[in-house]
Amino acid sequence: NDVKEFAPTYHKIDYQKIDKGQLLEINIFDLHFGKLCWGLETGDNYDTKIARKRFLNAISAIISRAKGYDIKRVLFPIGNDFFNSDDLNNQTTAGTPQDEDVRWQKTFRAGRQLLIDGIDMLSQIAPVDVVVVQGNHDWERSFYVGDVLDCWYNKNENVNVNNNPTPRKHYKFGNCLISYTHGNNEKVSD
């Protein structure tokens, strides 16, 4: 917890007072940040630059569509295979080899910055609740980046990060309960 005291200072945003506003949920799942694809082999090129552009374009497009709505809060679940691999050998959590764009350290740092950029964009609309949902490709890295975000936004009253180490996360808004899990370990009987 001592790292939190070094968190950057964000100024509190005075949002418009909304009594019965709506929740804006932005769920960009399976980004597989760090994945490398060659278009002639896979049908489409993909790398960290393309992933970053798609991620930020998706957030911008959803923000644009949400104009005119009274947004009370933003719910931003992250993880869900945000990263393509989980270890220094470029493997998933289960050990499946992956084609990676760059070194794992560079991927982690670039992914961390991408999430910060996205959260900062969203926090201009309304307070943001970040929920970390670990995936089958990036179980550990999702937790690590969630911990970094929790520390980073510690002094930011506009952002809350839920990085509890449970595979299922729950979020209540008004009379609605929204639940998340990556789904790779769920069974119909669950």
Name these PLM-found stretches.
Residues 1-190:
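Extended recognition/assembly regions associated with phosphoester-bond processing machinery
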